[in-house]
From Swiss-Prot:
Component of the A-type ATP synthase that produces ATP from ADP in the presence of a proton gradient across the membrane. The gene is atpE. Has multiple subunits with at least A(3), B(3), C, D, E, F, H, I and proteolipid K(x). This is A-type ATP synthase subunit E. Its main location: membrane. HAMAP family: ATP_synth_E_arch (MF_00311).
Length: 192
């Protein structure tokens, strides 16, 4: 019986050690699972935060992009309207009575004579007669000749006889200068 007691003791000791090892393994496994769950939760929270941050960035980019599109469309609409105003003003000037154009040609030629002593005058077809009458009728224009028709809406283009100087007193030039200096005012009137 002594041997059986020793065997039972060894067996009991083995069972206790096995139970202790099993308990330690279960505790370690539980700790590993808990740590894994904590780490997984941290990763999930970080991923959610990153996704939220990226979503916010995308939203900010999309809103900024949409604002740029709206602003570009608004500026294009403003430009279209300003172009229509410019075209309308040019048409109104072109449709003025013939005597107004004749007077303008005469005055522009007088101004040309102050800057050029002799030159060649170019006008559009409508203003040809007025230019020829001014050249033949004004002493200050005795050094001027009519050079022909050019593609302008009105006014005159005068070139010095030596070709060194050209005065562009066309309606387009005057309108362009007025438009450039008044564009800001026109925009404020039209668009506030």
């Amino acid at each position: 019986m002594g041997l059986e007691v020793v065997v039972d003791e060894i067996k009991a000791k083995g069972d206790r050690e096995a139970a202790a090892i099993k308990a330690a393994a279960e505790a370690q496994a539980k700790e590993i699972v808990n740590e894994a769950n904590l780490r997984a939760n941290e990763i999930r929270l970080a991923a959610e935060k990153d996704a939220d941050t990226q979503a916010d960035r995308i939203m900010i980019r999309e809103v900024a992009s949409a604002n740029l599109v709206v602003k570009r469309d608004f500026l294009n609409a403003q430009k279209e309207l300003l172009d229509k105003v410019y075209t309308s003003a040019a048409e109104e000037i072109a449709n003025l009575p013939a005597d107004v154009h004749a007077k303008a040609v005469r005055e522009l030629l007088k101004e040309s004579a102050k800057q050029i002593k002799a030159g060649v005058v170019f006008t559009n077809a409508r203003d040809e007669k007025a230019a020829k009458e001014a050249i033949s009728g004004l002493k200050t224009l005795s050094g001027f000749t009519f050079g022909g028709i050019t593609d302008i809406a009105g006014g005159v283009v005068v070139q010095s006889t030596d070709g060194q100087l050209t005065l562009d007193f066309s309606y387009q030039t005057f309108m362009g200068e007025v438009w450039e200096t008044s564009l800001k005012d026109a925009s404020e009137i039209l668009f506030g």
